[in-house]
Regions:
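Conserved beta-sheet core of the metallophosphoesterase superfamily
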Residues: 1-37
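A short C-terminal boundary segment appended to hydrolase-like catalytic domains
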Residues: 32, 36-98
Length: 98
């Protein structure tokens, strides 16, 4: 759906419903960024699996469709829409947001 949505993750599974946009010309609210997700899967000696998830917000900066990780974006002069995107992602992800 081109927008960041909540995800489910615990030690037994990870479900990502929507990571938003990575590279897109959609400049309206909720569609101007996304998430990069890193999932680590570990198989234990007893056969049990465990998972961990890190999701990093990214902003699609113009011109040139540059994908900017949030920690870099915080140091740049980006449009006001960037700050709004950060707020929206924090609201959607709640405690899972860094």
């Amino acid at each position: 759906p081109h927008v960041v949505q909540p995800f489910d993750a615990d030690s037994s599974h990870v479900v990502l419903y929507s990571l938003g946009n990575f590279v897109s010309n959609q400049r309206r609210r909720y569609c101007d960024g996304g998430l990069v997700a890193e999932i680590e899967a570990v198989r234990h000696p007893d056969g049990r699996m465990s998972y961990s998830l890190e999701a990093v917000p990214v902003w699609v900066a113009m011109p040139g469709y540059r994908v900017v990780p949030s920690e870099v974006g915080d140091t740049m002069a980006l449009p006001e829409a960037y700050a709004l995107f950060r707020e929206d992602v924090a609201e959607v992800l709640g405690g899972a947001y860094k």
